A protein has these predicted regions:
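FNR-like FAD-binding dehydrogenase module
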Residues: 1-622
Length: 622
């Protein structure tokens, strides 16, 4: 949208200048500018500050400028940071914001939403909410109770609270960042004052999140200057360096792990293919715990890449931009390694309109056609888009403005570092299906099954998941529900308990299609049963019986014993498909608690909520 005098508070000359400037800015420059403007207004009455050129200013230096500009102002010096996180991204970013504010002398309360005492909410002077959206617009597990409280009649008026929201999501889902949007709207309804605009982050969230953190930090520094601003800025820089120094290899700088093994876990005759990958971490300094995940940067299907290039009659050797600092690669390499081409999103189609001569595409992206848009993008890819909406004026140099970056795929770790030093194991099921007259392939799963050989290098990083962890006390009993590849983290759990000599009972419920061909890690479970590492194993193979049977039926059949384990302090873990399996498993748990605990439906729900708040009911679902 172009700024005009009629749709903005700017003069025609100002609007013209802004319209010329904004398209030329890099993401880094935009983030710098948003943070600078956040504190500029509050610092106007303070002593003038010499501002270096944008390209030469870091986020830490920006905060130092904010502190200097606000030296004449004093305000609250406490901040509450609440996060709701399923895989750990929101929690990591919340910790980063907390470190920055502590470095500037603020008193910081950092808490998962389900651990926060809600009677403290109305006392919060500054409130920062960092939350992801899970599934079909749902809050993460550790945000649900706080979300429900805030949207209930029990929520207090927050007239004295200033807030901002960072929302994480994925534009390939219909309800992109809905949970963050809900928090933003509800806090406003309760009277809280928004001090920085909500930022909605896609899967490539690092830059947008850094910009938001810089903006809210700048606002706080402008409103509540430290006693010694320059010193505080040095502390912030040291704090940031400490955070960044935790690991050389990160999401932004992945480790090239050598593939040691790539095995098919399914037996001959199976209609499924599940790969067991063993990767070397030697020399990386990376470590992980049971429950963590590995982020894998895959390659797109070379055949699909070549089809796209051929359709547009591009030169595969053309140089295109692939990095924020202007790094380039050949067009073919960019489509193989850097850009997403298998998923269509609403933002992608909206951007594509400018390069298409199709009136149908322009009509499809109109707000009133959202149902048709949702139906179209499901199961289609960039090649479909190109074929369906000709003609195109898209040039190879336009890629960075239209396609989003190829996001990493997260896989639950299937090994214990104590059991396999300098290694990490993954369990990946091959995804292939037919849709819209063409065969579709999962980007990472097909890469792993068809094109990845021992000796190859795979770019990876460790994704900590603090919301899915075995009990601190290894003698605590555990109940693990993991059908299919959902069993992966429980191999890590049990290997670790074996290494620690855990005395606690362990119960695994596993399911798949056929016993003979689809019993993943069968020999591991049998050995662990024989050695006493695994106390009880119940299985459900849905295609081996006339009537399909699933893990939730096995739970109900053993309901009395399962409830007894719960009463003895057992922790329950569920991993796998959220839409069907996890929902059915939770329903089975509620039935068991109600029937064998003598509780009403409301009482059973309260019991399960209490387990969740105690960290005794954890889910890693997708």
């Amino acid at each position: 949208m172009q700024l005009q005098v009629t749709n903005s508070p700017f003069t025609s000359e100002q609007a013209e200048l802004i319209n010329k400037l904004l398209p030329t800015l890099t993401e880094t420059q935009k983030n710098w500018l948003s943070g600078y403007l956040a504190f500029y207004r509050a610092g106007e009455e303070a002593a003038a500050v010499a501002v270096p050129e944008a390209g030469a200013v870091s986020v830490v230096e920006l905060e130092a400028l904010a502190a200097q500009a606000s030296a004449a102002s004093q305000g609250p010096r406490d901040a509450t940071i609440l996060f709701g996180s399923q895989t750990g991204n929101s929690q990591r970013l919340a910790g980063r914001l907390a470190d920055k504010l502590k470095g500037q002398g603020f008193e910081v309360t950092l808490s998962a939403m389900n651990q926060y005492k809600t009677n403290n909410l109305k006392k919060a002077g500054y409130l920062f909410v960092l939350v992801s959206t899970h599934g079909e617009g749902d809050p993460p597990d550790n945000a649900l109770t706080f979300y429900e409280f805030l949207h209930s009649k029990r929520a207090p008026k927050l007239d004295g609270t200033k807030f901002s929201v960072l929302a994480l999501g994925d534009t390939s889902y219909e309800f992109f960042c809905k949970t963050g949007q809900d928090f933003d709207a509800r806090l406003t309804e309760l009277g809280a004052e928004r001090i920085a605009d909500r930022v909605d982050c896609d899967v490539d969230f690092e830059d947008a999140a850094a910009g938001w953190i810089a903006a809210v930090t700048g606002v706080l520094l402008a409103a509540a200057a430290p006693a010694s601003a320059p010193q505080a800025a040095v502390i912030a820089a040291d704090s940031l360096a400490a955070v960044q120094g935790e690991s050389v290899y990160t999401r932004a700088n992945p480790f090239m792990a050598e593939v040691l093994e790539n095995l098919n876990l399914n037996g001959r005759g199976s209609d499924r293919e599940t790969r067991h990958l063993e990767l070397s971490l030697e020399g990386s300094g990376l470590s992980y715990e049971p429950g963590d995940a590995v982020g894998v940067y895959p390659q797109n299907d070379p055949a699909l890449v070549d089809d796209i290039i051929a359709f547009l009659q591009w030169n595969p050797e053309d140089a295109v931009v692939t990095g924020k600092a202007g790094e380039t690669s050949s067009l073919r390499e960019a489509l193989l390694h850097h850009y997403e081409i298998t998923v269509l999103t609403k933002p992608l189609l909206e951007k594509a309109v400018a390069f298409s001569g199709s009136a149908k595409l322009a009509e499809l992206v109109k707000p009133e056609n959202k149902d048709s848009l949702r139906a179209y993008v499901s199961g289609r890819d960039v090649l479909d888009l190109l074929r369906d909406f000709e003609p195109w004026t898209l040039g190879s140099g336009d890629l960075a403005n239209v396609l989003r970056k190829l996001p990493p795929r997260l896989y639950s770790i299937a090994s214990s570092l104590n059991s396999h030093p300098d290694e990490v194991h993954l369990t990946i099921r091959k995804v292939e299906y037919e849709a819209h007259g063409r065969e579709r392939k999962g980007v990472c799963s097909v890469y792993a099954s068809e094109r990845l050989e021992p000796g190859d290098k795979l770019p990876i990083f460790i994704q900590q998941n603090p919301n899915f962890k075995p009990p601190v006390n290894p003698d605590t009993p555990v109940i693990m529900v993991g059908p299919g590849t959902g069993v992966a983290p429980f191999r890590a759990f049990l290997e670790d308990r074996e290494e620690l000599g855990a005395a606690g009972k362990a119960w695994l419920l596993y399911g798949d299609r056929h016993f003979v061909t689809d019993f993943l890690y069968q020999t591991d479970w049998q050995r662990m049963l024989n050695d006493g590492v695994l106390t009880k194993l119940d299985v459900a193979f849905s295609r081996d019986t006339e009537e399909k049977v699933y893990v939730q039926q096995r739970m109900l059949e053993n309901g009395r014993e399962l409830y007894k384990w719960l009463e003895e302090g057992a922790h329950v873990y569920v991993c796998g498909d959220e839409k069907h399996m996890a929902h059915d498993v939770q329903a089975a748990l509620l039935d068991i608690i109600g029937q064998h605990g003598g509780k009403s439906p409301e009482g059973a729900a309260a019991y399960l909520t209490e387990l969740q708040e105690q960290g005794r009911y954890q889910r890693d679902v997708y």
